[in-house]
């Protein structure tokens, strides 16, 4: 990455037009091959070489990303637009322009760069980016993101999840342009311009951050990824545009500075680091927020200073990684594409820094840093990816992104200052998400706050996030910082060194501690400890007081930035690391060198962690960006946190960053790297912060830090390529883990990405991915490609084939299992359907019965007035007698009514035309009395026909039931019919009122004697009703069947028992009425009821509890209205008797009931038919038993 940065810087220095370099950068960032083009200057050439390699890998990755980027840009734009209509529009506009083409973007950026010299350019940039500043901001951001995305995509592509990506496009747009502008201007601007603008931006940024934080929070609340973006957008809406424009302009201006800074950073590592830091801080934040999403953009523009930071922080937080990246990304794009361009932006940014533009430039610039760091970009990308993943990814992914990133930092510096203030928040946020965390960090940062400080932690978990964000941020910040950082750098450096030492020693540990995220940042943090410390110190306070702390943190961060910058970058890189591990390595070295030894080594380990973390972070960011974003709302605190994060980030980054493992870093470090950059930013920013104000500067610091890492990023970039190329060999990815290399590398010059074939053997060709001068690591610096036809190639092919076959086999087995499961499920469903059908049939009968009751009785309707009708058709009583019987058993009273709505079902059964008619009329509210009489006659007929022997009893029963019995019997059986007719006067209503009680009694009957009296009568009623219903429901078939079953098998017994029972029942009823047969009747009745319930539910309880018992209750009530009254007297005795004889009575009574029912059914077809068939045997059996007991 560093190389890339150098190239960018060089290009910028050369004065190569941002456009030329920008496009190349962009290409590179996009992963295109034209690294040569990029490297106009020797530095550029060198970087280009590295980039080429990286680009190659990236191109593979990024070529797609590029398309993705553009497509995504639109996509993102859309998504962002979704997030914010206005911002989206802006973004879209920008995006569209950006997506138009890298060249276009570069061109725009170039223009911006050219304009870079003045704050106008920034505005122009804005204009370029979008018609309106607001739009421009989004566009810028988005475009940047897009470019960045393209750039990032290569390495960061992994990071740039589509979700994230959407924001990414935005940044890419901006980025492409920015890089251009950044590129040329960068050289032009040089750190000086950069610094100057940077500082104002810083202060501005700081100012903005306070405001921004609210937006930030808003953003955070607004949207996770987009939230941050969104809200910031609102506040930043105009500002965002401005910011974006500013970033663009800023990019143009700052880029020169930053590029130089970056160059320095890239080349020197230390100076560049610092400047990047500042840009990162400022740019990062601003950039990030606007970039993140729509908000990215918007915030990028006008609000950049305040909002952007917020946005960065807030936007970034949500999509911080992504968003900041987007913001950064734009910058990164500018950075990567127009690293030079971006620098100008930053310069401009610095110039504009005072104004919101400053921030935007930072934002723009931010992309540059990501660009600067390919990995950084990646990281940024990651961050962006996380928040604005695609942006981030784009930016980071492509090597160019890396360049852009560097540029970005430069470009971003101006915004960075703004961004910085924001960025600190962002950092804070990033802290959390690392890349997105910077932005996102804030939310988590609160808790993360320290972690934030541990931004690295962020980087760790969110290396990508942090990286992206940090990178993006850092880049932005870096930009700013580059700018500011250069100015600040001296001061910052001093500060940084002091703080570094402080933080290193002080914060270092705290950051790790603070930064649970240390995981990536942990080491990074540790490495960063000193760096982190400053950051942390600041950071920590920052977390406590996001607004205030951020500045301090920023400062601290900044302080560390120099030392930390790389680490942060490392972290970022680490994030990106995966993609561009080598970048971090490279960058870290430079950053490290300048930054300070402290973080370099520790960061390296962290970087490794970062790398892993990066992935984690990326994942986290991707998943957690939202959360982070949400957390982000605490923008201000997050800011503080973020600021700390940068520090931590830096801290963490440096380790990953460490020269030890360029490739590793590339994978692992790049995120860290990015982180580093941001830390540098913070470091630088810190000085700026003090200068501008603690708040903004610290943020800038973090941003700046990222910038720092970006320079290393360039070298790292090479490794990223390697990483990309690593595709061929996973070993390359191991580069990320290479912590040993970082230590070894720390003394060695920063690695340059050369990607030249170094050795060819019979079986493989070795390519030197990194050139570390005298220090070289075969594992991290070389990768080999097996030659076709070699044993190794064959082995690998066989292995691949084997794996593929195994996978296919597994897939097949899985499919088989799945099919099996499906079949089982289907079978289960079938069973369930069957069950439901049977239940429905039973219920339908039951419900319908109730319905009938409802029909006649107003109260009933609640039950299921329409159900009866509906039930009937479904249930063809005679068709499924067995099922019905079962269902009825389940449904106590439904037994008979359960047999299809009796009223309706009866017609189906049509056994008892009269009964059915009667039932139906009852249902239809026929004259109860008439129905009753009709039914009594019918029942008598049925009974006579069914059971001559029993006939008498039924007749008696009818008389007994007389009003309740006969009328009620059939009617209750028929549902409402019985109710109305049975208890025409009393029963209908009494039943209803007593329905609950009756039911309860029925339940109690099963449960206890207390309710049994009613139960017994109710039972009888239910039984009778069921009989009648059954007869009706079953119709001839059921009736005949029941008769056959009942009569034939146990007819005599049944009839005898039934007669006995009936007599008893009648007696009981009479007794109940007259309180005569309390015991016997209750028993008989109770048993009857119980029996009925048994037949119905096979258990009295089921019957009683069943809802249908309402029907039954009605029946019972109908029957029992009088009975109930009687049972009242019988209640006690019956209760006792029933309870005592419950078991006995139940079985005996069940039998009797069954017999009775059967006889009754015979008498009253409805009941008889359904329950009897199945129940018949059971009942006969029970009957025999009951006969003995009874």
Curated annotation (Swiss-Prot):
Expression across tissues: Widely expressed in various tissues including heart, lung, kidney, ovary, testis, prostate, placenta, skeletal Low levels in the liver, thymus and leukocytes. In the adult brain, broadly expressed in amygdala, caudate nucleus, corpus callosum, hippocampus, hypothalamus, substantia nigra, subthalamic nucleus, and thalamus. High levels in fetal tissues, especially brain.
Chain span(s) of sequence motif Nuclear localization signal: 16-32
Subcellular location: Nucleus; Cytoplasm, Perinuclear region; Cell junction
Region (HX repeat): 1049-1065
Disulfide bonds listed in the record: none
Any one Gene Ontology cellular component term annotated for this protein: anchoring junction
Keyword terms: Acetylation, Cell junction, Cytoplasm, Disease variant, Epilepsy, Intellectual disability, Isopeptide bond, Methylation, Neurodegeneration, Nucleus, Phosphoprotein, Transcription, Transcription regulation, Ubl conjugation
Low complexity bias: start-end ranges: 259-271, 350-366, 376-397, 485-507, 569-586, 622-632
Cross-link entry Glycyl lysine isopeptide (Lys-Gly) (interchain with G-Cter in SUMO2), positions: 1183
Motif (Nuclear export signal): 1033-1041
Polar residues bias locations: 129-152, 417-438
Residue ranges with Basic and acidic residues bias: 17-29, 45-63, 108-128, 795-839
Post-translational modification (record): Phosphorylated in vitro by MAPK8/JNK1 on Ser-739. Mutant ATN1 sequences with expanded poly-Gln (polyQ) traits are more slowly phosphorylated. Proteolytically cleaved, probably in the nucleus, to produce two C-terminal fragments of 140 kDa (F1) and 125 kDa (F2) each containing poly-Gln (polyQ) tracts. F2 is produced by cleavage by caspases and is exported into the cytoplasm. In vitro, cleavage increases with an increase in the number of polyQ tracts. C-terminal proteolytic products appear to be the cause of cell toxicity. In vitro cleavage at Asp-109.
GO biological process, one term: determination of adult lifespan
Disorder cited: Dentatorubral-pallidoluysian atrophy: Autosomal dominant neurodegenerative disorder characterized by a loss of neurons in the dentate nucleus, rubrum, glogus pallidus and Luys'body. Clinical features are myoclonus epilepsy, dementia, and cerebellar ataxia. Onset of the disease occurs usually in the second decade of life and death in the fourth. Congenital hypotonia, epilepsy, developmental delay, and digital anomalies: An autosomal dominant neurodevelopmental syndrome characterized by severe global developmental delay, impaired intellectual development, poor or absent language, significant motor disability with inability to walk, dysmorphic facial features, skeletal anomalies, and variable congenital malformations. Most patients also have seizures and structural brain abnormalities.
Free-text function comment from the UniProt entry: Transcriptional corepressor. Recruits NR2E1 to repress transcription. Promotes vascular smooth cell (VSMC) migration and orientation. Corepressor of MTG8 transcriptional repression. Has some intrinsic repression activity which is independent of the number of poly-Gln (polyQ) repeats.
Domain notes: The HX repeat motif is a specific pH-dependent interaction motif for ions and/or proteins or other biomolecules. This motif could be involved in the control of embryonic development.
Protein name: Atrophin-1
């Amino acid at each position: 990455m560093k190389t890339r940065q150098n190239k960018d810087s060089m290009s910028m220095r050369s004065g190569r037009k941002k456009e030329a370099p920008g496009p190349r950068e962009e290409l590179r960032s996009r992963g295109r091959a034209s690294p040569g083009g990029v490297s106009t200057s020797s530095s550029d050439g060198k970087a280009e070489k590295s980039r080429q390699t990286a680009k190659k890998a990236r191109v593979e990755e990024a070529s797609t990303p590029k398309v993705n980027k553009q497509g995504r840009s639109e996509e993102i734009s859309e998504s962002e637009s979704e997030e914010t209509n206005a911002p989206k529009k802006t973004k879209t506009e920008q995006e569209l322009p950006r997506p138009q083409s890298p060249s276009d973007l570069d061109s725009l950026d170039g223009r911006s760069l050219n304009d870079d010299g003045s704050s106008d350019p920034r505005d122009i940039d804005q204009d370029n980016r979008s018609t309106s500043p607001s739009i421009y901001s989004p566009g810028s951001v988005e475009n940047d993101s897009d470019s960045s995305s393209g750039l990032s995509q290569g390495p960061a592509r992994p990071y740039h999840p589509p979700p994230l990506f959407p924001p990414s496009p935005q940044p890419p747009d901006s980025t492409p342009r920015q890089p251009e502008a950044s590129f040329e201007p960068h050289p032009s601007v040089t750190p000086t311009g950069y610094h100057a603008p940077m500082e104002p931006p810083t202060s501005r940024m700081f100012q903005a951050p306070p405001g921004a934080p609210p937006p930030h929070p808003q953003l955070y609340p607004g949207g996770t990824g987009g939230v941050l973006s969104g809200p910031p957008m609102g506040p930043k809406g105009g500002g965002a545009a401005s910011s974006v424009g500013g970033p663009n302009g800023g990019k143009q201006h700052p880029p020169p500075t930053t590029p130089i800074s970056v160059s320095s950073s890239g080349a020197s590592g230390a100076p560049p680091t610092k400047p990047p830091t500042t840009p990162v801080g400022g740019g990062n934040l601003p950039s990030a927020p606007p970039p993140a999403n729509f908000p990215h953009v918007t915030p990028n523009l006008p609000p950049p200073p305040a909002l952007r930071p917020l946005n960065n922080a807030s936007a970034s937080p949500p999509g911080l990684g992504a968003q900041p990246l987007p913001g950064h990304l734009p910058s990164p794009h500018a950075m990567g594409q127009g690293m030079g361009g971006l620098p100008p932006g930053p310069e401009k940014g610095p110039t504009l820094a005072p104004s919101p533009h400053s921030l935007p430039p930072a934002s723009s610039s931010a992309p540059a840093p990501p660009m600067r760091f390919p990995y950084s970009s990646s990281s940024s990308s990651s961050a962006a990816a996380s928040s604005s993943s695609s942006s981030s990814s784009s930016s980071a992914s492509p090597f160019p992104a890396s360049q852009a990133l560097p540029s970005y930092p430069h470009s971003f510096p101006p915004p960075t200052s703004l961004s910085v203030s924001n960025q600190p928040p962002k950092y804070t946020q990033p802290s959390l998400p690392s890349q997105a965390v910077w932005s996102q960090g804030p939310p988590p940062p609160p808790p993360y706050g320290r972690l934030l400080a541990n931004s690295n932690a962020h980087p760790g978990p969110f290396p990508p996030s942090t990286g992206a964000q940090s990178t993006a941020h850092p880049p932005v910040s870096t930009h700013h910082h580059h700018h500011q950082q250069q100015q600040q750098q001296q001061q910052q450096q001093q500060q940084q060194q002091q703080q570094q030492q402080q933080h290193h020693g002080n914060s270092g540990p705290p950051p790790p501690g603070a930064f649970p995220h240390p995981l990536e940042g942990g080491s990074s943090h540790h490495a960063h400890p000193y760096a982190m410390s400053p950051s942390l110190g600041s950071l920590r306070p920052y977390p406590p007081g996001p607004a205030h702390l951020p500045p301090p943190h920023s400062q601290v961060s900044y302080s560390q930035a120099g030392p930390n910058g790389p680490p942060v970058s490392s972290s970022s890189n680490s994030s990106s690391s995966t993609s561009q591990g080598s970048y971090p390595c490279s960058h870290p070295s430079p950053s490290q060198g300048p930054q300070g030894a402290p973080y370099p080594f520790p960061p390296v380990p962290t970087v490794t962690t970062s790398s892993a973390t990066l992935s984690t972070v990326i994942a986290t960011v991707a998943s957690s960006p939202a959360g982070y974003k949400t957390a982000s709302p605490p923008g201000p605190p997050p800011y503080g946190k973020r600021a700390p994060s940068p520090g931590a980030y830096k801290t963490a980054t440096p380790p990953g960053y460490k020269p030890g493992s360029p490739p590793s870093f590339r994978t692992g470090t790049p995120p860290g790297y990015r982180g580093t950059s941001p830390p540098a930013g913070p470091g630088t920013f810190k000085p700026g912060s003090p200068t501008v104000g603690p708040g903004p500067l610290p943020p800038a610091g973090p941003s700046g830090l990222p910038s720092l890492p970006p320079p290393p990023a360039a070298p790292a970039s090479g490794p990223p390529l390697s990483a990309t190329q690593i595709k061929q060999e996973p070993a390359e990815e191991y580069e990320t883990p290479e912590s040993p290399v970082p230590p070894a590398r720390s003394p060695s010059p920063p690695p340059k990405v050369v990607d030249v074939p170094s050795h060819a053997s019979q079986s493989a060709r070795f390519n030197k991915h990194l050139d570390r001068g005298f220090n070289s690591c075969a594992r991290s610096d070389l990768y080999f490609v097996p030659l076709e036809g070699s044993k190794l190639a064959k082995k690998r092919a066989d292995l691949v084939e084997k794996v593929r076959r195994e996978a296919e086999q597994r897939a097949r087995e899985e499919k088989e299992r799945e099919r099996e499961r499906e079949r089982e499920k289907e079978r289960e469903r079938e069973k369930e359907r069957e069950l439901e059908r049977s239940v429905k049939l039973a219920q339908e009968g039951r419900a319908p019965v109730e319905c009938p009751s409802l029909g006649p009785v107003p109260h009933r309707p609640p039950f299921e007035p329409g159900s009866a009708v509906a039930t009937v058709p479904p249930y063809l009583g005679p068709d499924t007698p067995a099922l019905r019987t079962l269902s009825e058993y389940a449904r106590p009273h439904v037994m008979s009514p359960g047999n299809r709505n009796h009223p309706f079902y009866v017609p189906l059964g049509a056994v008892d035309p009269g009964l059915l008619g009667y039932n139906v009329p009852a249902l239809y509210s026929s004259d109860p009395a008439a129905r009753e009489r009709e039914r009594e006659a019918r029942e008598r007929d049925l009974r006579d026909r069914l059971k001559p022997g029993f006939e008498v009893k039924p007749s008696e029963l009818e008389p007994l039931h007389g009003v309740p019995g006969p009328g009620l019997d059939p009617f209750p059986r028929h549902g409402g019919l019985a109710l109305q007719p049975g208890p025409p006067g009393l029963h209908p209503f009494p039943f209803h009122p007593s329905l609950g009680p009756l039911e309860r009694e029925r339940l109690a009957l099963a449960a206890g004697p207390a309710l049994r009296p009613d139960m017994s009568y109710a039972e009888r009623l239910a039984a009778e009703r069921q009989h009648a219903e059954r007869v009706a429901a079953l119709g001839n078939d059921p009736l005949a069947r029941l008769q056959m079953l009942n009569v034939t098998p146990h007819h005599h017994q049944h009839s005898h028992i039934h007669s006995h029972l009936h007599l008893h029942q009648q007696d009981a009823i009479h007794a109940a009425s007259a309180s005569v047969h309390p015991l016997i009747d209750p028993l008989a009745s109770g048993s009857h009821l119980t029996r009925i319930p048994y037949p119905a539910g096979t258990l009295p309880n089921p019957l009683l509890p069943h809802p249908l018992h309402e029907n039954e209750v009605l029946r019972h009530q109908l029957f029992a209205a009088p009975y109930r009254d009687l049972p009242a007297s019988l209640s006690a005795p019956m209760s006792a008797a029933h309870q005592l004889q419950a078991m006995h009575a139940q079985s005996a009574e069940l039998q009797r009931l069954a017999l009775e029912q059967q006889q009754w059914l015979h008498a009253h077809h409805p009941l008889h038919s359904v329950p009897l068939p199945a129940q018949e045997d059971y009942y006969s059996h029970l009957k025999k038993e009951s006969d003995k007991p009874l």
